[in-house]
Amino acid sequence: MINLFYEESYWFGTNRMTGPRAVVRNLLDSLHDQKIPYAINEEKYEHNFIVQYDRNGYIKHSNLTLENCVIGPQIWFFDEHVKELQQNSERYKSIIVPSQWTKDLAINKFGFERVETWPVGIPLPEIKRDDDVHQFDCIIYSKRRSVQELNDVVDLLNKKNMSFRTLVYGNYNQEDLALMCSRAKFCFLLNGTESQGIAVQEIMSHNVPIFSWDVSEWNDM
């Protein structure tokens, strides 16, 4: 039994998929699957899970039983209200982050205590992929990379006479992703730094081979 705190205003009025929306969607699906009771934006049960620690999450946090609060994974370490947690570790039970590298960052760069990794679950695809039937060659998945880099990928595929479809982060819905994964031979991943990489893991869950043009640094620092 758990209390969840988040704001649907992050994605209200659109069916486009983003990381924050996917975290909440997959979390709720997991709780339903395991038949775990939960409340949303009220302290009904003993344990508090502040999924989105934005300004609204900070205000909600101040009115909760602090020692029962787990905070994350949607927490931006540069926010002023987040910095207060660095000097007041008694205000939370644990900070959770979606991967080992973000845990190392939270501890070594920002000085947080009691940090745990918690990657959200990835649902199995409802549309089954047939490796013998493809309608096009490649999905280009683009997130936080330059227009020039995207154009370079397009030029490369065109030179090889490969057909493709493009998914740009924030401009597609879940049905788009699932349908393309069921019809493509492979994915060209043109991605920035990821904390967990939910969309990437969803593509992998469809058994789609991924070619990744990697990055070696986090440009937000």
Indicate where each model-derived feature is located.
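N-terminal pre-catalytic "stem/leader" segment of glycosyltransferase-like enzymes
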Residues: 1-61
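Conserved catalytic-core segment of nucleotide-activated headgroup transferases in glycan assembly
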Residues: 14-16, 22-23, 120-177
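Active-site proximal beta-strand in glycosyltransferases
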Residues: 48-80, 96
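A conserved, positively charged/aromatic
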Residues: 84-93
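Donor nucleotide-sugar binding/catalytic pocket of nucleotide-sugar-dependent glycosyltransferases
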Residues: 93-104, 112-126
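Short alpha-helical donor nucleotide-sugar binding micro-motif in glycosyltransferases
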Residues: 179-184
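Aromatic "clamp/platform" in nucleotide-sugar-dependent glycosyltransferases that forms part
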Residues: 192
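Catalytic binding pocket for nucleotide-activated donors in carbohydrate/polymer assembly enzymes
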Residues: 196-221
